[in-house]
Regions:
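Signature of the catalytic double-stranded beta-helix
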Residues: 24-40
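N-terminal secretory/targeting leader peptides
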Residues: 1-5, 9-24, 40-273
Length: 273
């Protein structure tokens, strides 16, 4: 039961996407019913704090491999490191998942304990030295496509504050959200360029075949949890209801920004940065 409760908590910031990025999930949190459900979740798990979500992350890369992988058959049976609900999703895809802390990933790749791994982004991945054990980096994945950080505030302390001071905390979290997201894009892109230019890392976009299979994995995992836990299903249904309306508008209204990028710079996979 405790494990299911923690999985419910994970459900707020990992996946499946339903077309949403982490930015839209934060919109659901604040204006789509997510906040009330999250407070219920914290009470169920036994955490006595108020959580402010901030810094929505770009989708996490699929990660580091010994070669370019393009087909589901390329990764089936592969020993791979990830954590959270993504372990269930990628296991459903046929991968052999190992949950390892960040500091153990690079040594595990070096010794062969795992054959592939993800951690978070080009900056943290390079700090762990992943470029020293792999030269094949796959960007874009649905395994953890909408994560964010959280600022926890003791509930008793928060409730003792005046409404004005509570509002200051909330809006400070919003400010940190935007500022850190802007900084992350600058930092991640600069470190990706360093990986490509100084360490000769090959960078790929994860294939649609693999992405589609990840979504099928999510369907299975979410379906299994929905059957076991009505509250988990309640959270999922709320997200789906929000995504169906909001993303209908957003995805139909957004032009193809990749088309505009390639109009200026050429095929994205061949652009040198």
């Amino acid at each position: 039961r405790r494990q299911r409760q923690m999985c419910i908590r994970d459900r707020f910031g990992t996946g499946p996407s339903y077309g949403m990025s982490s930015q839209e999930v934060m919109g659901w949190m604040e204006y789509g019913g997510g906040r009330k459900l999250y407070d219920e979740t914290l009470a169920k798990v036994g955490f006595d704090y108020i959580g402010f979500f901030h810094m929505p992350m770009p989708a996490q890369p699929f990660g580091w491999f010994k070669k370019n992988v393009t087909k589901v058959s390329d990764v089936k049976g592969m020993k791979y490191r990830t954590v959270g609900l993504a372990t269930n999703v990628l296991t459903a895809m046929g991968m052999v998942v190992r949950q390892l802390p960040g500091g153990e990933i690079q040594p595990a790749m070096k010794t062969g304990l795992i054959e592939a791994a993800e951690f978070n982004n080009p900056t943290s991945d390079s700090q762990f030295g992943m470029q020293d054990v792999s030269k094949h980096y796959h960007l874009g994945s649905f395994h953890q496509s909408q994560e964010m950080f959280e600022i926890p505030v003791n509930k008793k302390t928060y409730n003792s504050l005046s409404p004005a001071h509570q509002a200051i905390l909330k809006n400070a979290a919003y400010a940190a959200n935007s500022d850190n997201y802007f900084k992350a894009l600058v930092r991640y892109s600069a470190d990706l360029a360093k990986l490509m230019n100084e360490h000769k890392v090959n960078v790929y976009q994860t294939s649609d075949e693999i992405l589609a299979q990840q979504l099928k994995g999510w369907d299975k995992v979410i379906g299994d949890f929905n059957k076991k836990d009505p509250f988990f299903k309640k959270v999922v249904d709320s997200q789906k209801s929000y995504a169906k309306r909001v993303m209908k508008y957003l995805l139909m209204n957004q032009p193809n920004y990749k088309l505009a990028y390639e109009n200026e710079f050429g095929p994205i996979g061949k652009v040198k940065i």
